[in-house]
Amino acid sequence: MVTSEQVLAAFRRRLQSNKKLAGLLRSADGYGKANDFAKTCGKELAQVIAGVASEFAGLDAKAIYGILEPSLKENYAEVAKFCKTAQKAIYREAGLGLGALEPAYSEVIARNAYRVAEGIAEATEPLTLEGLANLVAHAGMTVVDTSIDTNAEAAANMGLETHIVRTYDGVGLHNGKNPCKWCMDRAGDWTDYQSAYDAGCFERHPGCGCKIDYHVGKTRTWSNRAGTWR
């Protein structure tokens, strides 16, 4: 039986050799590339899981999670590191000497990590590589959402201006690629944190590809054309 240590070691090797991840981290000037980073990490872990998936046959979600938990927490840590770098860049852009808050390993993040094991255990047929990658990517994108939520709330509590945008991804992967009313209801553009929170901006269902972006400043002039905070 494959061990959690073996899976984690294989995942770390793939992370270290992935040039795209290194490039995304170097160019993290905000949250615009955060979902891409989370998806890329998800693909790397999915490759590792696919290589040992046959050993999960007959195991329940709890047993599978016991093997994958260290790697799923490593995935969280990688995405959280990107988010912290992105948040620092946002404060720098706004001329604010503030420290970025790292997204905590919350109940929501932990639950979505566990859903990876549930998805594997409950599948009637072996999951495809794409299916595995989507499961892990969802867990990673939840980290991005939590980071934006945490830092936007902190900025609002300090009396800073915030601008939050949630963009609908165009399809609902969970419902046969038909328009997703749940996501469309949560898409929008808000100039204060509380309105975004009340609208469900930071929520995400499995298969959701919506993108959330966030900027902060003492005073703001948002240009839709430039897409930057001035």
Regions found by a protein language model. Name each.
Residues 1-205, 213-230:
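Domain-core detector
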